[in-house]
Amino acid sequence: MSGFSRRELLIGGGLAAPTLMFPREGFSAAAFPAKNIQFIIPYAPGGGFDVYVRLIGPVMEKYLPNRVGIVPVNIAAGGGSRGVAQLYRAKPDGYSVGILNIPGMFILQQQQGTGAYDLSRFSWIGTMGEGERYAISVGAKSPMKSFADLKALSAKRPVKFSVTGPEGTAYAATMIGTQLLGIRPQLISGYKGSADYVIAAIRGDSDAVIAAIPTTLRFARGGQLRVLASFETHSSIPGVPDAAALGQPELDQISVERFVGAPPGLPAPTQNVLATALAKSLQDPVVVKWAKDNDLLMVPRAPDATAKLIAEQRAFFDKWRKYLVTG
């Protein structure tokens, strides 16, 4: 698995996963599951969310009470909204779960104005690892050597940032990050993936780029990027100023999370089985090795902690809605 090079396979790690406690509520392990479970991926095969499910799903099977399969189902349409809507409408029996991009789904729902699903009503199973924070970088050949240089450029003219389309979390990170840091942005948008818009900055098509730290580190280690600032509270990149040093603690709230959910109304005992299996899979030797090989941080979350996190994410991104919907 160490051959993957996508940004979703790299998360700065090193923390031990916490021990989770899930309520039993008198559940009989023999009752569920009795057949295969479909795992909805609202994106095309080969992307980061797809990779996560296809790696962790088979490991998760080992920790279910009965021997059944977890079957990935890609539903790539509407920027992810069709797959999420299908999951939302599925029968709440535990045989349909899905991976959701947060805040991507918040942003998409705000832009599309769809009422096909209510993200606050999903039955949450947990998360696939710790969320990715962001960093500001410039191409290695850029004359800018520090964050102060970037600010100085912004005082003269808007800074050109290469980004994805408005539906992407990188777009949101760039809009919110520049507002918090007082940088005047000029967005060059429409790049389809993280590699595309980062390479644009490396080529010099833009002045700078705000990308997830895993992606940033991959290019920085290759000598192609120079990191100027981290959005983490405490920078994982030596010598790089962080949110605390920049005086903007809210930067650490800009992240992309991989939530695992089920339809509204999932019975608590069934939710417990799925949540326990997911949490144990993240601590399985196979996943631990994969995470270590790819600088990943896999932190299990119980359903209540997951629901709390999604509420916090919603509140944060609602605060910045005007920048995300109108651009």
Q: Where are the regions that the model predicts?
A:
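N-terminal secretory signal peptides and thylakoid transit peptides that target proteins
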Residues: M1-A16
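Short loop/turn segments at beta->alpha junctions
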Residues: S5, G79, S146, K192-G193, ...
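N-terminal signal peptide c-region/cleavage motif recognized by signal peptidases
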Residues: P23-E25
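N-terminal (or domain-start) structured segment
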Residues: F27-R121, A170, L180-A208, F219, ...
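An extracytoplasmic/periplasmic, membrane-proximal ligand-sensing/linker region
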Residues: A34-N36, Q179, P269-G327
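Hinge/capping helix and adjacent helix->loop/strand transition within the periplasmic-binding protein
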Residues: Q86-S96, Q109-D196, A243-A245, E257-W290
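Solvent-exposed loop/turn segments at secondary-structure junctions
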Residues: P103-M105, P143, E167-A170, T215-T216, ...
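C-terminal lobe and pocket-closing loops
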Residues: T215-L282, A315
